[in-house]
Amino acid sequence: MPRLPPILRLLQAPAKFTVVPKAHVSAKPAKTPTSAVEQAVGISAIVVGFMVPAGWVLAHLESYKKSSAA
């Protein structure tokens, strides 16, 4: 057990000297504003991306239960 702290120090050493570049954050408004149609398409794509797989799993839950019991 006495060897654990030196090993942990070796693992932590590279993290101390890592240089993280500055993020380029802009506080300006967008050059081309996003239209309502673009926002609707984007939001619906995200909703479909999350809900379709969840719905698939819920719709086939009984078959998953049967296959795992065998």
Swiss-Prot record:
Subcellular location: Mitochondrion inner membrane
GO annotation (BP), single: mitochondrial electron transport, cytochrome c to oxygen
Any one cellular-component term (Gene Ontology): mitochondrial inner membrane
Pathway assigned in UniProt: Energy metabolism; oxidative phosphorylation
Transit peptide limits: 1-24
Keyword rRNA-binding belongs to the record: no
Intervals, Mitochondrial matrix compartment: 25-38
Residues that span the membrane, as ranges: 39-60
Top-rank taxon: Eukaryota
Residues exposed to the Mitochondrial intermembrane side: 61-70
Gene3D superfamilies per record: Cytochrome c oxidase, subunit 8
Membrane topology: Single-pass membrane protein
Any matching Pfam family: COX8
Keywords of the record: Membrane, Mitochondrion, Mitochondrion inner membrane, Transit peptide, Transmembrane, Transmembrane helix
InterPro entries noted in UniProt: Cyt_c_oxidase_su8, Cyt_c_oxidase_su8_sf
Family: Belongs to the cytochrome c oxidase VIII family.
Physiological role: Component of the cytochrome c oxidase, the last enzyme in the mitochondrial electron transport chain which drives oxidative phosphorylation. The respiratory chain contains 3 multisubunit complexes succinate dehydrogenase (complex II, CII), ubiquinol-cytochrome c oxidoreductase (cytochrome b-c1 complex, complex III, CIII) and cytochrome c oxidase (complex IV, CIV), that cooperate to transfer electrons derived from NADH and succinate to molecular oxygen, creating an electrochemical gradient over the inner membrane that drives transmembrane transport and the ATP synthase.
The protein's assembly and partners: Component of the cytochrome c oxidase (complex IV, CIV), a multisubunit enzyme composed of 14 subunits. The complex is composed of a catalytic core of 3 subunits MT-CO1, MT-CO2 and MT-CO3, encoded in the mitochondrial DNA, and 11 supernumerary subunits COX4I, COX5A, COX5B, COX6A, COX6B, COX6C, COX7A, COX7B, COX7C, COX8 and NDUFA4, which are encoded in the nuclear genome.
Identification of the protein by name: Cytochrome c oxidase subunit 8B, mitochondrial
Record gene name: Cox8b
